[in-house]
Amino acid sequence: MSAFRVAIITASDKGYAGQREDLSGPAIREIVEANGYEVTHTVILPDDREMLAAEIARICDEDVADLLLTTGGTGFSPRDCMPEATLSVVERAVPGIPEAMRLFSLKYSQRSMLSRAAAGIRRRTLVVNLPGSPKAVRENLEYAIPTLAHGLEMLRGEGSADCAR
């Protein structure tokens, strides 16, 4: 089995404008590479629903990655739109992933219940929204990545077809 390919989208108006350094995207890269995944694409985009949706769709449709991880845009700010962009282009929602991450994160911060993160599948790519803070990215991704690997194997037609075990 070859390494899973990962694309990373950071949603940040200030990051896109060069006014803030992206720390969450590199945190994602560090974690996935430490787990044997290959990062094939990274991009910083503004909090613009249409731009984000178009990039998510392009990555999935052009088979750029097996796993697309996004960071940022999942909160209550008026410009936060990553879940809406994600859900507008995925073909199948996977609500259990963000539900589990929110539940896990409650032990670190009650504010995690304010996350609007979403997840879904388009073609053969799993799309997962992560929080915008590097600390929350690490907590969520380190928790979820072992289970995500099983889902990715299933999308590839490898491994057990049993989600329940």
Go through the PLM ranges and name each one.
Residues 1-165:
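Non-catalytic beta/alpha edge segments that cap or flank active sites
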